[in-house]
Amino acid sequence: MTQAVMLQGTASDVGKSVLAAGLCRIFYQDGLRTAPFKSQNMALNSGITSDGKEMGRAQIFQAEAAGITPDVRMNPVLLKPTSDRQAQVVLMGKVATNMDAVSYHDYKPRLREQILAVYNSLAQEYDVIVLEGAGSPAEINLRDRDIVNMGMAEMAQCPVILVADIDRGGVFAAIYGTLALLHKQERDRVKGVIINKFRGDVALLYSGIEQIESLTGVPVLGVMPWLDVDLEDEDGVALQNDKYRGNAPRDITIAIVQLPHISNFTDFNALAAQPDVRIRYIRRPEALTDADLVILPGSKNTLSDLAWLRESGMADALLQTHRQGVPVMGICGGYQMLGDTIVDEVESGLGTQPGLGLLNTITRFAQDKITTQVNATMSGELPSWLAAAAGLPVRGYEIHMGETVLQEGCCTAMTLQKNGCSVADGAVTADGLAFGTYLHGLFDSDAFTRAVVNGLRARKGLAPWETTFCYAEHKARQFDLLAEAMRQHIDIDKIYTIMQQHQEPV
């Protein structure tokens, strides 16, 4: 029988995704066929499987930690917020509809059977399933139709480990309060607690751990220290962390505009890992002053975010920075914003709107979403700071619902290989100061990233770095460091025992 364990949290951003990835790595190292699973994920960071299905980035990097190819069954329901009240509902990797929160809450019971079937299908192929919940299981207003926390644990008939974040304070109240709000049968599923993100002398916690174990009857399986590992963050709230504030001195500073509906900020993890690059996420015009490159990232609501750029003063500041000779790059929604015109009768219903005008392009939104992995080749001749990237192979993925047409004065940035055909993508101006593409994950291509960074170095009179940084090897090292730390600070043998003793037939 397949064994399973589920990580649930006392709140969002307590570290469930990273610890789930660590368990996947540990079980993989121990020779077990392991897969991650999250029944419902709400995130703007998504990726594309090899068969063109869209799923949450967290389950993609957890699958990588487990040494397996990402499979959309690992995240059958993906919710992508389009506004404060609505989200795009993606089922088994394809867009189903848009719903508001109330409509989706009413819709959830219809998903239970499909989710259970998908879970059972996955479980038949693996020795261990590492499940992840969402937010907190103590959301008592959502309990009756829950499909992602205790509702999912019940479907999988698996034990639960509760993760609590001590860094934000009040960890013992969070543990006690969460368990107190659960029904008895739900509480009985919780077989252990992990205290996460601790800084300092763990001996200071011992008396508190003894008391919380006595009060709840649930053992604390370990205290994880705050780890300096470079792994993907799932939630936009993570952009508030020190990791993204870019205070460390580096040769090259890249400013990424933190749009209100930013999506796929994981595009920039490989860029941030470069030894000579400082990444800063910015929301204020004055923060553009020292940038060597400005990037407009993807957006789940392009025209709304374009309006925010204008209202906040960021658009004027960005155009002024561009006039001063600083290159500006756009990815997906950011690429669309850089153009002259956006015609949207689909996403926002705002019709025809002017873009920023840095690229002479016209974008028209469409109903059908393009979701595919692609190989590409950069154009044979590229100007200025992009010149060293000319002709290089790159790989990435597309997630968009629009088509962009180049007008006079723009050149194609790259050629994609799709279904045996060559397809033009992206645009670049003759001076290289404006560059856009639909390709997410572009910076995961090591040679391209080093060429781009060296081009920026040359603009500052700095010598190029001859060594190319391998991001795939870097990620593998981070997974191993995480697994090593978890083995040191968490009772992994106890987790094995919990899985063996408390897994029930589904």
Swiss-Prot record:
GO terms for biological process: cobalamin biosynthetic process. GO terms for molecular function: ABC-type vitamin B12 transporter activity; catalytic activity. Catalyzes amidations at positions B, D, E, and G on adenosylcobyrinic A,C-diamide. NH(2) groups are provided by glutamine, and one molecule of ATP is hydrogenolyzed for each amidation. Residues 251-448 form the GATase cobBQ-type domain. PANTHER family: COBYRIC ACID SYNTHASE, DETHIOBIOTIN SYNTHETASE. This is Cobyric acid synthase. InterPro entries: Class_I_gatase-like (IPR029062), CobQ/CobB/MinD/ParA_Nub-bd_dom (IPR002586), CobQ_GATase1 (IPR033949), CobQ_N (IPR047045), CobQ_synth (IPR004459), GATase_3 (IPR011698), P-loop_NTPase (IPR027417). It comes from the Bacteria. Belongs to the CobB/CobQ family. CobQ subfamily. It holds the Pfam family GATase_3. Keywords: Cobalamin biosynthesis, Glutamine amidotransferase. Pathway: Cofactor biosynthesis; adenosylcobalamin biosynthesis. Transmembrane segments: none annotated. The active site is at C332 (nucleophile), H440.
